[in-house]
From Swiss-Prot:
UniProt gene name: mdpH-1
Name of this chain's protein: Decarboxylase
Keyword vocabulary terms for this entry: Lyase
Enzymatic class: lyase
Pathway where it operates: Secondary metabolite biosynthesis
Catalytic activity: atrochrysone carboxylate + H(+) = atrochrysone + CO2
UniProt GO MF annotations: lyase activity; oxidoreductase activity
Length: 161
């Protein structure tokens, strides 16, 4: 099977790539994995979802044992030993990987500026997260496969405003 020829120019545009904020989180010291997961799913997520929709967030995922979100408990981290090889030899020890996907950086900044966010969510992070050890990064994401099908960008996502 031959591989397709790459395009002559970089065809990535604002229509087929999105920004993704990734939070590599640690749970608060002394908190169990189960208590962390429960707080994220039953308290933090319900508080956060509507605010994200209000400001145009396209996708938010959190890695946890519950099927709707994903955390990185010891149980699943140990699966890495089955696929480790010389290229994939370092296992991340974060408790949570949260990703927020949006088209416009200003949309995410509006969330952080929202008075409701400041009143209800900023302080809540201290209840479950080790905010001193957790890390963040942001970058463009481009989609190549969606639900088992090769795609061109983000078909079906709302276009730029």
């Amino acid at each position: 099977m031959s591989t397709p020829n790459p395009p002559a120019t970089n065809s990535t545009t604002s229509e087929d790539r999105l920004l993704c904020l990734t939070i590599l989180g640690y749970r608060k010291q002394g908190m169990s994995e189960e208590a962390y997961r429960k707080h994220m799913i039953e308290h933090s997520a319900p508080l956060t979802k509507d605010l994200m929709i209000k400001y145009g967030i396209l996708r938010w995922t959190v890695k946890c044992p519950d099927r709707s979100k994903i955390h990185n408990p010891t149980e699943t981290r140990e699966l890495m030993y089955e696929i480790m090889d010389p290229q994939m030899a370092n296992i991340a020890d974060y408790d949570c990987f949260s990703q927020v996907v949006f088209r416009n950086f200003e949309d995410y900044k509006k969330i952080k500026d929202d008075p409701w966010y400041k009143e209800h969510l900023v302080g809540d992070h201290e209840n479950f997260a080790d905010t001193k050890r957790s890390k963040m990064t942001i970058g463009w994401i481009t989609q190549f496969i969606d639900r088992g099908v090769v795609t061109e960008g983000f078909e079906g996502f709302p276009g730029p405003k």
